[in-house]
Amino acid sequence: MEVRRDIYQAIADPTRRAIISIIALQAMTPNAIAEHFDTSRQAISKHLKILTECELVGQKQNGREIYYQLEASKMQELDKWLQQFRTIWENKFNELDTILETLKKEK
């Protein structure tokens, strides 16, 4: 039975978010990724497994090496979900700007 991980649980971990940031620039092997952390390669492999299970990260084989790369389509799914909050906060900041301008004119 295949376990499907939730992408929001996956990005809740700061190490996994850091891994995403690192491989967003270029595909990397687990060893290359592990060099960026003060943790074991096995721990990084566990994080990569979780990111792969929720499809935020994909694998590609190049000879004997496996490279991990960011899956942009899943990041777009996250971005779409976050957009609703961006809109809410932009509206609130616009309202605040209006209030501040009104107060400034009253002085």
Question: What are the functions of these language-model segments?
Answer:
Residues 1-5, 10, 21-36, 41, ...:
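C-terminal regulatory/oligomerization modules of transcriptional regulators
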Residues 17-19:
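Pre-recognition alpha-helix immediately N-terminal to the DNA-recognition helix
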Residues 61-67:
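Short, Lys/Arg-rich nucleic-acid/phosphate-binding segment
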